[in-house]
């Protein structure tokens, strides 16, 4: 027997309903249809609100980028071949007001420049967008925001396509010999608001436009197999098939990090980097052990984010045990903090270290702790 755990009541009800019809079993569930209608209306309202808000926000970002970077972009040489690094920028990613410090790739840019490469960075801004754009404008490094390369016309066309798109699986999808097609379609119909991102889709246009302007021999990006990544890679390969894409896995990979574990169907239909570099050999083994056979080459590499640890002295273990609680950048993480503190606060032999996510500092969740 197989067990599928479903944490949404309305989806569970709908699956039982469809199963009952198939097996000619009477199914009685008071107010199921009413709940479904209410849920559908809620989903539609939230979806349109999210898309319109995203559309307006992107329009603002596109024109803000063009206001600051239009002349700078015109003066950038298009004859050189660049190593392009796709990274991120926070408000704290700057020193001396005129230098950008890459929070994910450290000194990689400086190393490549020393080795006679032309380097350009393109970043997603996380935090106060206008403040970050102003700081990017004043720095010495060649760094551009992703939104600079998005066409307003493409934004409008993509927006119309997304709001009229109906997500539906047409083929039978099996997991452990169980047909999950109906489940997936029910999920998609009620979670469209969470599954579609206008910004993620537009990474195709952004990277495609950039690679039509600038020549690139190598494109380097973070690699977590997030939704924006295949759109980014598709845009690059469409504009410049010869560009080699290197995905740098930059953090811990556990046995339940399923976003890293791709099987044959996904590998066949998903654009991936030409090579994936991991943080050390252990991470490499975990990904290889849980992936299909046609996965791109995986190489063990260094931890660029943690270069500062080379300066640290080795610390010997103490009797007091430490537990590191690394938080995600989502609002509900306070529940994890509360759980850990409640369970372990009375144990004097354990020290709890809480590491907040860069986009969600403790100051934003401490009211719930």
Question: Predicted regions span which residues?
Answer:
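Catalytic-core helical/loop segments in enzymes performing group transfer/polymerization on anionic/lipid-linked
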Residues: 1-369
